[in-house]
C-alpha cells in the first residue's frame, strides 16, 4: 500500500497522483500515491485503516473536507478558521495533523502572477507599485470560499466583500469573522450589487469560488465591475478557459486566470508539509497546462 493517497468521491479524475509523482521525482523519492473512493458510511474507517497500515499523508477532497476536520487530533490555525481539512499528516507520535492548503495555494499563485507582493500587499497593475488599500469581491460562500477566506484576510490593507445567492449564508460567515476580531470582511446583497450605480465600486480582485463554472453557468455579477485592470480569478479550471474567465476577458479585463496554478501550489505545500521539501511549481504547472491544451 502507498504511504500517500487522496480520499473523496469522485476521485477518478484527480490529478493529485501525477502531481505528487512529479514532485517526488524531483527529489528522487518514491512517487506512489493512491486514489481512495470513500462513502459517507466508510470514510472514517477507510481513513483510519489507511494510517493504521502505514499511511503517512492524505489529501481530502469533496465531499469530506469538513468530516476530516472533525477527526484530526491537531489542527493548523487556518484549518480551524475554515473548519475544513484537505491535508493530513501522521506525526511521529501517531496523532493526525490536519491542515488546509487551499488558501496557501491561492496566495502563492497570486504571488507567482505578481498580483500580490512577497509580503502580501496588492500590486497596482497600472504602475506596478504597492497599493495602499485593496477591495476583493468573493463570489460564493461554500466550502471553496471558506477555505481561502483566512488567507485573503491576511493580505495587507484589504477588504473582502462576499456575495452569494443565499444572502444569509454570506452574513453568517461575516458574523463569524467579526466575532473573532476580523473586521475587514463584509457581505453585499446580490440585488444591490447588480444595480448599476453600486456596480461602479472598484474591485481590485474578483474571485469566483462558486460552483458556477463547474456547471458552465455565469455567476450573477454585473459587467460594470470589470475594468482593464481588474484581476479576475476562477478557482476552477478546464481544458479551455472557464465560462467565468471568458466572460471577464470579453468585458475588458486584461488579467484573467483559472485555478490550475492554485491546484499545483496547494499540492506543493502539502508535499512540503509531509516531507519538509519545497518542490518546483513552474515545471509541473507548465506540464499540466500543456496537457490541458492538447
Swiss-Prot record:
Annotated Gene Ontology cellular component terms: cytosol
InterPro entries on file: Aminoacid_DH-like_N_sf (IPR046346), NAD(P)-bd_dom_sf (IPR036291), SDH_C (IPR041121), Shikimate_DH (IPR011342), Shikimate_DH-bd_N (IPR013708), Shikimate_DH_fam (IPR022893), Shikm_DH/Glu-tRNA_Rdtase (IPR006151)
Top-level taxon of origin: Bacteria
Catalytic activity: shikimate + NADP(+) = 3-dehydroshikimate + NADPH + H(+)
Positions with a binding annotation for NADP(+): 77, 140-144, 235, 259
Residues the record marks as active site: 65
GO terms of biological process kind: amino acid biosynthetic process; aromatic amino acid family biosynthetic process; chorismate biosynthetic process; shikimate metabolic process
Primary role: Involved in the biosynthesis of the chorismate, which leads to the biosynthesis of aromatic amino acids. Catalyzes the reversible NADPH linked reduction of 3-dehydroshikimate (DHSA) to yield shikimate (SA).
Name of the featured protein: Shikimate dehydrogenase (NADP(+))
Amino acid at each position: 500500500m502507498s504511504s500517500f493517497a487522496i480520499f473523496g468521491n469522485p476521485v477518478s479524475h484527480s490529478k493529485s497522483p501525477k502531481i505528487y509523482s512529479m514532485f517526488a521525482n524531483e527529489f528522487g523519492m518514491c512517487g506512489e500515491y493512491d486514489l481512495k473512493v470513500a462513502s459517507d458510511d466508510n470514510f472514517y474507517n477507510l481513513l483510519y485503516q489507511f494510517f493504521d497500515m502505514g499511511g503517512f499523508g492524505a489529501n481530502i477532497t469533496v465531499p469530506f473536507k469538513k468530516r476530516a476536520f472533525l477527526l484530526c487530533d491537531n489542527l493548523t490555525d487556518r484549518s480551524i478558521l475554515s473548519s475544513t481539512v484537505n491535508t493530513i499528516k501522521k506525526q511521529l507520535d501517531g496523532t493526525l495533523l490536519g491542515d488546509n492548503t487551499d488558501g496557501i495555494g491561492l496566495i502563492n499563485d497570486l504571488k507567482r502572477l505578481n498580483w500580490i507582493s512577497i509580503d502580501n500587499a496588492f500590486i497596482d497593475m497600472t504602475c506596478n507599485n504597492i497599493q495602499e488599500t485593496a477591495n476583493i469581491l468573493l463570489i460564493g460562500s461554500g466550502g471553496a470560499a471558506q477555505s481561502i477566506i483566512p488567507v485573503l484576510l491576511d493580505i495587507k490593507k484589504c477588504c473582502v466583500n462576499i456575495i452569494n445567492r443565499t444572502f444569509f449564508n454570506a452574513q453568517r460567515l461575516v458574523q463569524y469573522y467579526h466575532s473573532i476580531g476580523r473586521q475587514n470582511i463584509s457581505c453585499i446583497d446580490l440585488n444591490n450589487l447588480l444595480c448599476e450605480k453600486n456596480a461602479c465600486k472598484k474591485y481590485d480582485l474578483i474571485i469566483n469560488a462558486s460552483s458556477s463554472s463547474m456547471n458552465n453557468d455565469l455567476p450573477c455579477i454585473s459587467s460594470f465591475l470589470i475594468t482593464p485592470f481588474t484581476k479576475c480569478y476562477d478557482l476552477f479550471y478546464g481544458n479551455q478557459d472557464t465560462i467565468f474567465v471568458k466572460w471577464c476577458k470579453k468585458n475588458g479585463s486584461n488579467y484573467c486566470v483559472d485555478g490550475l496554478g492554485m491546484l499545483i501550489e496547494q499540492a506543493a505545500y502539502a508535499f512540503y508539509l509531509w516531507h519538509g521539501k519545497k518542490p518546483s511549481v513552474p515545471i509541473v504547472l507548465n506540464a499540466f497546462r500543456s496537457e490541458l491544451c492538447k
